Amino acid sequence: SPAMPVPGPMGPMGPRGPPGSPGASGPQGFTGPPGEPGEAGSAGAMGPRGPAGPPGKNGEDGESGKPGRGGERGPPGPQGARGFSGLDGAKGDSGPAGPKGESGAPGENGTPGAMGPRGLPGERGRTGAAGAAGARGNDGAAGAAGPPGPTGPAGPPGFPGGPGAKGDAGAQGGRGPEGPAGARGEPGNPGPAGAAGPSGNPGTDGAAGPKGTPGAAGVAGAPGFPGPRGPSGPQGAAGAPGPKGNTGEVGAPGAKGEAGAKGEAGAPGVQGPPGPSGEEGKRGARGEPGAAGARGAPGERGGPGGRGFPGSDGPAGPKGATGERGAPGAVGPKGATGESGRTGEPGLPGAKGMTGSPGSPGPDGKTGPAGPSGQDGRPGPPGPVGARGQPGVMGFPGPKGAAGEGGKPGERGVMGPTGAAGAPGKDGDVGAPGPSGPAGPAGERGEQGPAGAPGFQGLPGPQGALGETGKPGEQGLPGEAGATGPAGARGDRGFPGERGAPGALGPAGARGSPGSXGNDGAKGDAGAPGAPGAQGPPGLQGMPGERGAAGLPGLRGDRGDQGAKGADGAPGKDGPRGLTGPLGLPGPAGATGDKGEPGPAGPVGPGGARGAPGERGESGPPGPAGFAGPPGADGQPGAKGEAGDNGAKGDAGPPGAAGPTGAPGPQGPVGNTGPKGARGAAGPPGATGFPGAAGRVGPPGPSGNPGPPGPAGGPGKEGPKGNRGETGPAGRTGEVGAAGPPGPAGEKSAGLPGPQGLAGQRGLPGQRGERGFPGLPGPAXEPGKPGPSGPGGERGPPGPMGPPGLAGAPGEPGREGSPGNEGSAGRDGAAGPKGDRGESGPSGAPGAPGPPGAPGPVGPAGKNGDRGETGPAGPAGSAGPAGPRGPAGALGLRGDKGESGEAGERGMKGHRGFTGMQGPPGPAGSSGEQGPAGAAGPAGPRGPAGSAGSPGKDGMSGLPGPTGPPGPRSGEMGPAGPPGPPGPPGAPGAPGGGFDLGFLSQPQEKAPDPYRMYDDANVLRDRDLEVDSTLKSLSQQLEQLRSPDGTRFTYSVLEDGCTSHTGTWGKLPLLDLAPMDVGAPDQEFGLEVGPVCFL
């Protein structure tokens, strides 16, 4: 049977087609560049005189005039300042002694003299009477500290201090011993089915099963191959001639006969497929001239003509603009001498004279009165300790302590509400140019512009009318044989042949490949119970407890790295039809089709409308230069275009100059607490503390390895239509694809039959076919003439070949035969009728790109595209100038507690005092005897932070430590008497057994975060969970206060009485807790807090 045809490779590119008919006229070209400047015109007439220039610069100063005449005497000047004293005159001679005068009147008392020196101390006078008590003097300055007095008795314990700030996490403890094995957990839910494992090796063959019941009849198998031909039977007796038999099988081809006489020409065969293009034929004889063609398209615009002759002079131009200011003129001649000046005013007073010499000393004064008494002497040595005084009045509350240290930064709060819109930012960079606005209305016609540059090549014009049929060329050489035609459709089923003899048994087939694994079998019966196992080793730490309630959603994390690409989703629905794409480049010229036969002439059509004007013809020779026309009127301004889009953001400007200093801001709130003081000396070691509560869950571990990609997601919703992308660059030509499936049979009529292939090798004998249906009886033959019955002859030679029988059913295709020898070329057949139009050939290689088309008019503005994705962050701008210092922030929230300090020793239990206000601490007393261990002391000063250890596993709670030995007691405890009057408060001793809930927060346990409540229906459920978890955490911590035997008093709260929720949060206001007389000195007590309402 003929082999299936395979499409051949693409043929070579056909010859270039004839040039297309001229294209339509192109659009008006762009305005050309301005022409070269014309030559300068002749000089205009002289303009009128310009306006006067501005005044020139001042001339240089003239030379000095001659001195004027002397002025008249001026009026007297004002009184001058007093001159310096003159020097003392020389001492005069002594005069003669005068006569004694009379006694004068007593003079006035002289002024008291300066105080004389201190007199010697007088003798001690007698003791005077005691004066009245003076008013209380001001407090003296504090004296130097006296030596410490003896230790007073221990005072009652003060109230516990407020909780200290939370300490930093301590260093990681060592890992505790492994606990006993926990109880076995309940079986988990069955996991999902694992992926199918690889096929196992084939097992050994099992024993043969019992014979199954016969199955239902199977579908009839395909017909087997024909069996080998059976041996000939013995010759039978000659029968009577039977009816005409069915056609026999085709015999083997006979030997080649001699050539017969030339037959008559057959009917023309069906046209074969077109052969490949022949080589170019010789040029035919020149045809007759055709009819005149249509008028050609106008040629391209000619280049600019030669330069014209200069025109005649134009009229005089308008008056010129005012000239620039002239240069300064030369210096003028020297001026005449001026008049004399006025007389000058009197001068300023002279400088002060020098100081005179000092006078002689005066006489001594009288003795002054005694001076005040001297200062007090130094304090004497301390006196003995006085008797114990009465208790003082309760003091006023002390001043507010200094603010504690700033807390550690709190956890990041919930995202706040969106802030108000910020002030407008700086002007952005200039945006990219916006799209062109719509064209404005046309202005009035301007003057004729200079000649434009030649326009771009126009688009190809429409197809011209068909030319007349050319004369036939010379006959080409015969083409090569075409490719083998496709296989014909399958013929009708032939009549069934006789049933063949059974074939021999075929060899056993090869062993089949192992089958796929069967489904799981039914569950087997339970096996017998095994023997009990030996005691196993203790198990590992038990499974974690039940999962706690869900926490609040965390803050939004930073954006994760881009995940791995997921598996391709199922294809989405078809999107909406896209916009029409841009016009493609013109394809390469197709091969010239066969020329059609001329159709009948149509009737004459009506006259067409007037055609568009042709392109401008070539320039004629330049005419003589015309006179210059008057200037045309200015055109009206065009309409204002729409504003373009905002430009891109400009570069940041240089920083502005510093502004003036602003007015001082308002007084800021109290600043943060100052730095922490230096660490105090460590106290004596404290008693063993209670075991800490279980630590909080450690920080999340490092990210696990990325999981396998998730299953493909379902198809997404139909996305919005994307913006139209820009046309991408042309891809490179792809490689030849694999051969496609054979197309449907074309409409071509059958090709010429190909040469006969060599006979294929004989197929394997087929299995015995099913019994065919009985054939139809053949047509009755003519009866033979009865011959004389001869004796039985021997078997004669084979008779001549009978006529060929009808075609049997087509056998299965044989293997492809080897190609036959090339036959000799047949004679040229007569030309067949014109074939139907062939199917489009494969696309040729892309032609060279055509010239660019003329730019089209500006299209209407498109709709705004969807908002683009956020672009990558731009580079950071340069830092702006520092802003003014903002006001001080509000006082921060109270920070976490500091680390626990080292515990102090336990003090003795004091007598019960008044419940007074907490006094200031007294000086440290000397250590008393070792008393019984007190409760844990308050938190000490915060130690320096150790380097944070890596978080250890949460250890199991340790067993309670042993109780310390009791201290010595004075005597047996007598029966309790009635409470006596309160005793005086003792001097403060070393800090003792006050006790503070802060000790519950162990260094590695962070107290529960204060919870927030919102008035929002969606948050109610979360809030309830959060309240639960907070209270559960509190109760777990307080549970560690239980007494050693586990008994405790509990007061349960049975309902939540909260009726309103304010949206604010509050701390549980347990400000202080002072257990009084709980029992024995080392008695523990418990406290459990249930739900609370804030009123």
UniProtKB/Swiss-Prot annotation:
Residues 1-21, 147-160, 699-712, 848-858, 976-988 have a biased composition (Pro residues). GO terms for molecular function: extracellular matrix structural constituent. Residues 22-49, 127-145, 180-223, 232-270, 288-297, 385-400, 477-489, 498-544, 577-592, 625-661, 675-697, 804-822, 872-893, 924-960 have a biased composition (Low complexity). Residues 1062-1095 form the Fibrillar collagen NC1 domain. InterPro entries: Collagen, Collagen_superfamily, Fib_collagen_C. One of its GO terms (cellular component) is extracellular space. Transmembrane segments: none annotated. Residues 1-1011 are annotated as: Disordered. The keyword Secreted applies. It is found in: Secreted, Extracellular space, Extracellular matrix. The keyword Transport does not apply. Belongs to the fibrillar collagen family. PANTHER family: COLLAGEN ALPHA, COLLAGEN TRIPLE HELIX REPEAT. This is Collagen, type I, alpha 1a. It comes from Epinephelus caninus (Dogtooth grouper).
